[in-house]
Amino acid sequence: MSAIQRWLDRFCYKHPRFGIPNLMLVIVVGNVLVWLMDQFSYGVSLSALLAFSPYYILHGQIWRIITFVFVPLDSNLFFLAVSLYFYYMIGSVLEREWGTAKFNVFYGLGVLLNVVVGFLLYAVTAPLYPSHLLPLLTTASMTYVNLSLFFAFATLYPNMQVLLFFIIPIKIKWLAWIDAALFGWSVLSSLFGVFTSGLAALPGVIIPLVAILNYFIFFWDNFLQLFGRVKYQTSRQTVNFKKATKQAQQQKG
């Protein structure tokens, strides 16, 4: 276990009441309220007032550092409802598995990392835009936080089945592998862009990896165990092959 993971476990053990109980319920209710306000407000978008805009944050609207977590990722009611239900479900399961403190640390760390990424992205991209467009730049959302939440759930419950398109039963691990492949392809495409287009494409490599760093911190031991198990199984098979070859030679002799 890494030093960071040991520290996290000790912190959560000593502070079991740290954080907000039923955090995902708070997030879901907040998203629903903001969506409703957007639908019934005329000329004023609450989402625009809460979104992560570094320009406005640096000009005093510091609430945006937190309130962007309540900005809906979809304006379509059906897709928003499905998304919120899904993330409420997996978030609630993770909170029961880990406890309130550890789940809040995981989620809060994801939000913090995306705030850092948002400011980094703004620092890189702001010089490319005229000054009158800077207020329109929103450089962080809950996309990567939700992705890290999904990866965490799939790691702990890989064989749980869900209905894809409400029809096709599929294990959660296969959906996670698909998301991981798309995520990896996006990073590799940006990495290729560094060699073809220059350093302007570098944020596309660094930012996604930093944004889901909370997942890697919490599940680093799982990666080590996975690679260790594969290495062990490969080594064991090699030894068995040598023994089988030697036995076959002895039988021929």
Model regions and ranges:
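Alpha-helical transmembrane segments and their helix-entry boundary regions
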Residues: 103-107, 165, 175
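Small-residue-rich segments of transmembrane alpha-helices in multi-pass membrane proteins
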Residues: 111-115, 171-183
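N-terminal TM1-TM2 helical hairpin plus the immediately adjacent luminal interfacial "cap"
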Residues: 16-116, 122-126, 130-132, 197-203
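Juxtamembrane/interfacial segments flanking transmembrane helices
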Residues: 44-45, 157-170, 219-231
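Hydrophobic alpha-helical transmembrane segments in multi-pass integral membrane proteins
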Residues: 119-123, 178-195
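Membrane-interface micro-motifs in multi-pass membrane enzymes
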Residues: 124, 128, 132-161, 169-174
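Hydrophobic core segments of alpha-helical transmembrane domains in multi-pass membrane proteins
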Residues: 81-85, 143-151, 167, 203-221
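Cytosolic, positively charged, low-complexity intrinsically disordered regions immediately flanking transmembrane
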Residues: 1-14, 195-253
